[in-house]
Swiss-Prot record:
Pfam families: Hexapep, LpxD. Catalyzes the N-acylation of UDP-3-O-acylglucosamine using 3-hydroxyacyl-ACP as the acyl donor. Is involved in the biosynthesis of lipid A, a phosphorylated glycolipid that anchors the lipopolysaccharide to the outer membrane of the cell. Signal peptide: none annotated. The keyword Lipid metabolism applies. Its EC number is 2.3.1.191. Pathway: Bacterial outer membrane biogenesis; LPS lipid A biosynthesis. It comes from Desulfotalea psychrophila (strain LSv54 / DSM 12343). InterPro entries: Hexapep (IPR001451), LpxD (IPR007691), Trimer_LpxA-like_sf (IPR011004), UDP_GlcNAc_AcTrfase_non-rep (IPR020573). GO terms for biological process: lipid A biosynthetic process. Keywords: Acyltransferase, Lipid A biosynthesis, Lipid biosynthesis, Lipid metabolism, Repeat, Transferase. Homotrimer. This is UDP-3-O-acylglucosamine N-acyltransferase. GO terms for cellular component: membrane. The lineage of its organism: Bacteria, Pseudomonadati, Thermodesulfobacteriota, Desulfobulbia, Desulfobulbales. Belongs to the transferase hexapeptide repeat family. LpxD subfamily.
Length: 345
């Protein structure tokens, strides 16, 4: 972790404007409420601006429109949330110091492993594995045969990378996740018996992808399951065989994507959303949490509900649903009035 960095240096990283003393030294990124001398923090909610007048922080990242005076040095930016992420990451970065391969790790035959790696205790590495420089593999990771892992990767404890999987550069995979497990494919005969279809494809994970804990990315039946560059996948996500997740897409916890569905660039799937198989979901689509996607979606669509439909239409249906008990009373009263009128005739 970096210490004693000037505010001016941090502002330069994010194209920020310094208001106050740019030579103030900071090194610890904390919340606005707890920040003290030597700390840097950020303000996102406009309603919290009053905290700026009393903060003890060394520096605060704020939006350019904020005009409140503060004892702290301010860094004014166009997007405080984004700037905070960049600065926090910079402060936490350490120069990679390779520790080599732990004596309890197992390494198979024909492997090409950079000398600039850290491979912790009880890691198992299969045959013909390639691992690039500055990659860190933590305890209990299992790597199958013919796997390729690029530069600057991080595999947390107990990750499994199955045979033939390909990881690009800068990939982070958190504990318990399985890459390359068999896809779910069976053929059923007339008697109802299920016969497993061989799953002989692979998984490709491109550069700068991050996958959370306890998620599964299944290998393709044939060809590739493909997670493209910059995609960010949360914990507890299921990605089935032959799925394609487009560049910079965001897949939130408990999402399930069925086989052979393809997502475009910058798609967002909210928590617990699901998509059936063999769909085409266009660039920039946003799918509300808990939705069920049953048909193709054009680029830029914003949808919600089951089945997923345009977001305004779904919201209207939700409002109407909450009014059903009241509407039922009105219908009963109306029915009674009609029956009374009919009886008089």
């Amino acid at each position: 972790m970096k210490e004693n960095i000037t505010v001016a240096m941090l502002a330069e990283l994010v194209d920020g404007e310094v208001i106050g003393d740019g030579e103030v030294l900071v090194g610890n990124f904390v919340s606005l409420e707890t920040a003290g001398e030597g700390d840097i923090t950020f303000l996102v909610k406009a309603g919290d601006q009053d905290l700026l007048t009393s903060t003890k922080a060394g520096a605060v990242i704020v939006h350019r429109k904020v005009e409140v005076e503060s004892p702290a040095t301010l860094i004014k930016v166009d997007d405080a949330y984004l700037a905070a992420a960049k600065i926090h990451t910079f402060l936490l970065e350490d120069e990679f110091s390779p520790e080599g391969i732990h004596r309890s790790a197992f390494v198979g035959e024909g492997c090409q492993i950079s000398s600039e790696v850290t491979i912790k205790a009880l890691v198992s590495i299969g045959n013909r594995v390639v691992i690039g420089p500055r990659t860190r593999i933590e305890s209990g990771v299992a790597i199958g045969d013919d796997v390729t892992i690029g530069e600057d990767c991080l595999l947390k404890a107990n990750v499994t990378i199955a045979d033939g999987s390909q990881l690009g550069n800068g990939v982070t995979i958190h504990s318990g996740t399985v890459i390359g497990s068999d896809g779910y494919g069976y053929a059923t005969d007339k008697m109802g018996f299920h016969y497993k279809r061989p799953q002989v494809g692979t998984v490709r994970v491109d550069d700068n992808v991050e996958i959370g804990a306890n998620s599964c990315v299944d290998r393709a039946t044939y060809g590739l399951t493909w997670i493209k560059s910059g995609a960010k996948i949360d914990n507890l996500v299921q990605i089935a065989h032959n799925v394609v997740v487009g560049e910079n897409s965001l897949i939130v916890s408990q999402v399930g994507i069925s086989g052979s569905t393809s997502l475009g660039r910058n798609v967002v799937m909210g928590g617990k959303a699901a998509a059936v198989g063999h769909l085409q979901i266009g660039d920039g689509v946003m799918i509300a949490g808990g939705s069920g996607v049953l048909s193709n979606l054009s680029a830029g669509a914003v949808v919600g509900g089951i089945p997923a439909r345009p977001i305004k239409q779904w919201r209207k249906s939700v409002v109407l649903t909450t009014k059903l008990p009241e509407m039922q009373k009105d219908i009963r009263a109306l029915k009674k009035s009609v029956e009374e009128l009919a009886g008089k005739n």
